[in-house]
From Swiss-Prot:
Residues 35-94 are annotated as: Disordered. This is Securin. Coiled coil: none annotated. It comes from Gorilla gorilla gorilla (Western lowland gorilla). The modification Phosphoserine is found at residue 165. Phosphorylated at Ser-165 by CDK1 during mitosis. A motif (SH3-binding) lies at residues 163-173. The lineage of its organism: Eukaryota, Metazoa, Chordata, Craniata, Vertebrata. A motif (TEK-box 2) lies at residues 94-96. The keyword Lipid metabolism does not apply. Interacts with RPS10 and DNAJA1. Interacts with the caspase-like ESPL1, and prevents its protease activity probably by covering its active site. Interacts with TP53 and blocks its activity probably by blocking its binding to DNA. Interacts with the Ku 70 kDa subunit of ds-DNA kinase. Interacts with PTTG1IP.
Amino acid sequence: MATLIYVDKENGEPGTRVAAKDGLKLGSAPSIKALDGRSQVSTPRFGKTFDAPPALPKATRKALGTVNRATEKSVKTKGPLKQKQPSFSAKKMTEKTVKAKSSVPASDDAYPEIEKFFPFNPLDFESFDLPEEHQIAHLPLSGVPLMILDEERELEKLFQLGPPSPVRMPSPPWESNLLQSPSSILSTLDVELPPVCCDIDI
């Protein structure tokens, strides 16, 4: 970019630019360049010199044309090959699906113990159904803990008791009478410990 700006300043016209390859030619003789139909003489510059590769002859452009022709031929030859590949991949896909179908029963036979991890039905523990002859819709069951009765006679006893009521818990002895002396409260908390064995030598 710096060389392009320098060439613009040298030519005096901001619109004319010289390519970097043309501007960096080596040699002591002045070279004549045609810019916008006029011939100008550019003198070799002093200062930093960059080693640029020599300009390629124009014959190489013909080689590029032949390369392009060769690539076009290779593209034409690759066209039918690409059409054959999808059919080949389709055959592979059908073979893979057949193999996958045949391997599904083999996987079930290889791991039969997976089904034995859960021998019970979890829904059995969630359902507490009563026979139709027992109607409990008329009972106020809000706040009643879940009770599982093993025998039917205990279930009949439960229906004979009537609607459930909260049961009063027996109060502990130290809360029964708040006017007791501390010694009487401590006497209720005393626990007899086994006698100490003094025969053991330390």
